[in-house]
Curated annotation (Swiss-Prot):
One of its GO terms (cellular component) is ribosome. The keyword Ribosomal protein applies. This is Small ribosomal subunit protein eS1. GO terms for biological process: translation. Belongs to the eukaryotic ribosomal protein eS1 family. Keywords: Ribonucleoprotein, Ribosomal protein. It comes from the Archaea. Disulfide bonds: none annotated. SMART domains: Ribosomal_S3Ae. One of its GO terms (molecular function) is structural constituent of ribosome.
Length: 215
């Protein structure tokens, strides 16, 4: 009897929930990226949604990359989001770094023209051993490049650039006089603050519901 009551109560609670659609922000096309069950709109706010970047850009070479969106508010059953970061799968990164290759990591807090701050993590893989001088030069050029690019764009445009196709060729071009790099990736980004809204942690979770909704 107790088991039957528990099952009945669970079914009734499930029936009380509503299906919500989750949209990418306008600067990424306002596409529907996921659907999720919630008790009400308040239960949806602050959930984090993970979406393949290939679905946003149409570039299926980016199938290893995931974008993260946080739900900020709901209008009816439509949930609005902001981009809070992205990442490339660890397995893909490990495949890049093989024997007789060197890895150079660059991590910078990038400030955009509208005073948002996003941490950008770049990984560079060389085809062979490089001198410490070359490593220093590569780090400096790419650091200057990404910081200056951030200052030239508002957050919305910088996000599109960050997950788009042009950034790879631009980084290759920026370093071509130092070393003929072939493998550079922005392996991860994390929003720190959005135009005055401080301390946005990509990993924080809404305690009342499932924290990550996967498409």
């Amino acid at each position: 009897m107790a088991g039957e009551k528990f099952q009945k109560k669970g079914k009734e609670k499930w029936k009380e929930k509503v299906w919500y659609t989750v949209e990418a922000p306008p600067y990424l096309g306002s596409k529907e990226v996921s659907v999720a069950l919630g008790e009400d709109s308040n239960s949806m706010v602050n959930r984090v949604v993970e979406v393949p970047i290939s679905e946003l850009t149409g570039n299926f070479k980016k199938s290893n990359e995931k974008a993260l969106f946080r739900i900020t508010n709901c209008e009816g059953t439509k949930c609005k989001t902001i981009f809070i970061g992205h990442y490339i799968g660890d397995d893909y990164i490990r495949r890049l770094v093989r024997r007789r290759k060197e890895r150079i990591d660059i991590i910078e807090d990038v400030k955009t023209s509208d005073n948002s701050i996003i941490t950008v993590k770049i990984v560079v893989v060389t085809d062979g051993k490089v001198t410490n001088t070359k490593k220093f030069q590569i780090r400096k050029v790419l650091t200057d490049f990404i910081l200056n690019k951030g200052l030239s764009l508002p957050y919305s445009e910088f996000v599109r650039y960050l997950i788009g196709d042009d950034i790879y060729n631009d980084m290759i071009s920026a370093t071509k006089d130092i070393y003929p790099l072939k493998k550079i990736e922005v392996r991860k980004s994390e929003l720190v603050s959005l135009s005055g809204i401080s301390e946005i942690h990509a990993g924080s979770q809404n305690s009342g519901e499932e924290p990550v909704v996967q498409n």
